[in-house]
């Protein structure tokens, strides 16, 4: 499957819909879930989406970074129907490059 890795912030609706197709959502407490998700999406410093040919989001990576030395991946998920196709690895490579990569 061909995917494009996009640097973009997901809307709360997009992210919640994606969570239904992955096990990633199980990490979030149920209390005030819909209230907290917009803040999570707004405050993350790095947000990537893997999008297939039809425009469907099939992978997500979010993290915190200083864009110089460090990257902390907080969320990495792939659609259950698309696992074992290298999508997570593509997201990690793109995140590493955007966060500073190996420049030294």
Predicted regions and their residues:
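A short helix-loop-beta-strand connector motif used in the catalytic cores of GNAT acetyltransferases and
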Residues: 38-49
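Conserved acetyl-CoA-binding loop-helix of GNAT-fold acetyltransferases
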Residues: 78, 84-97
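Short, intrinsically disordered, charge-balanced linker/junction segments flanking boundaries
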Residues: 100-104
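Short amphipathic alpha-helix that is part of the acyltransferase structural core
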Residues: 1-30, 54
